[in-house]
Amino acid sequence: MQKEKTTQTRWRVKRESSMIAVIFEVWPKPDKKQKYLDLAATLRPILERIDGFISIERFESLTEPGKILSLSFFRDEAAVAAWRNVEKHRRAQASGRTEIFANYRLRVASVIRDYSMHDRNQAPVDSQARYG
């Protein structure tokens, strides 16, 4: 697996198999949002050192007040497992469950295509025929 820096996105991943998306939806308790964001910020430098980590972004829902989505990409399941088992991350998970989160949902998915307006290699054939 090689990473190649691009201007359109942080990383375009050349891969033999699909990368993994981790979609973490969290509803912090009303007075715990900042605590969650601070905790996530302390974990980020550790996450960035995980072999196979690609990127992470956080979004706040426009339609569901209080809901935050964290979208992470990893090279493979081994990278996800490495992150999941970092002891400081495990302690943060426990803290989230006991004091920060009202609820959360975690989805882990394989990325089946990865293309952009300018990098069309994995675009479906019909889309390539129509838009190049």
Outline where the language-model segments fall.
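Short S/T/G/P-rich N-terminal loop/turn motif that feeds into the first structured element of a domain
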Residues: 1-68, 77-85, 101-132
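Conserved short loop/helix modules at catalytic or binding sites
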Residues: 92, 96
